[in-house]
Amino acid sequence: MQLALICENPERQNELDELAQRWGLSHDENSIFALVLTDTQLELRKLDEAKLGAVFVDLVSGAAAHRRKFGGGRGQAIAKAVGLKKGVMPRVLDGTAGLGRDAFVLASLGCTVQMVERHPVVAALLDDGLARAKQDPEIGGWITERLSLLHASSQDALVKLLEDPDFIAPDVVYLDPMYPHKKKSALVKKEMRVFQTLVGADNDADSLFAPAMALATKRVVVKRPDYAEFLANAKPSTAIETKKNRFDVYVKAAMT
């Protein structure tokens, strides 16, 4: 993929070069997107809409820290959806990791989560945020133990993992496909505006459902906007609703 590659600290230029090679990125000075390596982090900027600010992964402070400390623990809708309860810590595969927020919440509650992200820029941002979080004295220990990242197409990853005899199948496959926002919602979060331009909607999301159901041993959970149809038109066993979203739960077996 091509976009502007910018290093703000000359001493880190080698890091940016290695990063570009690892994720298959090449420099395009005319791109409206820039992947910028600052003194502290990797971030994405939309150059023609500077007011949107930078998009980066921060699992240590800000919103992530607030949700970890005050987000409601196991009472959160996502925790209920994956079947998290006393004595039950599901192994989760997050097939559409994005910026890792939902995976981080589940890991902070005790789940082991393997994240899958197919877009190279998003995967690079997530990998950078994960690396920084692992260095944090407060959360680094359990981040290292519980969170991992696989860069691959979600569908390919699900199928390949299903065929791998050494892979321990997850209890839960969690999917949160990018869904087109309603045109009238002008105040879409800056990240979503940047992402929808860069990544686009997951138009092939329906194709994730069958391999997800085959891979999960206990359940599949699909996060949807409240106005969205069911993934692959499959009616869930149950649904947990929040103010703006819905967690469709497809139960295969009881959580034990």
From Swiss-Prot:
Q: Do you know which InterPro entries this protein is assigned to?
A: 16SrRNA_methylTrfase_J, SAM-dependent_MTases_sf
Specify one Pfam family.
SAM_MT
Gene Ontology cellular component terms for the protein in this record: cytoplasm
* GO MF annotations in UniProt: rRNA (guanine-N2-)-methyltransferase activity
What's the catalysed reaction?
A: guanosine(1516) in 16S rRNA + S-adenosyl-L-methionine = N(2)-methylguanosine(1516) in 16S rRNA + S-adenosyl-L-homocysteine + H(+)
Among Gene3D superfamilies, the record links this protein to:
Vaccinia Virus protein VP39, YhiQ-like domain
Q: What is its EC number?
A: 2.1.1.242
- The residues that the entry says bind S-adenosyl-L-methionine are R101, D102, E117, R118, S153, S154, D176
Record's keyword annotation contains Cytoplasm: yes
Q: Which top-rank group of organisms is this from?
A: Bacteria
Q: Among its keywords, does the record have Zinc?
A: no
Q: Which terms are listed as keywords in the entry?
A: Cytoplasm, Methyltransferase, rRNA processing, S-adenosyl-L-methionine, Transferase
Positions of disulphide bridges: none
State the SUPFAM superfamilies in the record. S-adenosyl-L-methionine-dependent methyltransferases (SSF53335)
Catalytic class of the enzyme: transferase
Subcellular location per UniProt equals: Cytoplasm
Tell me its family: Belongs to the methyltransferase superfamily. RsmJ family.
Instruction: Please explain the role this protein plays, according to its UniProt record.
Output: Specifically methylates the guanosine in position 1516 of 16S rRNA.
The name this protein carries in UniProt is: Ribosomal RNA small subunit methyltransferase J
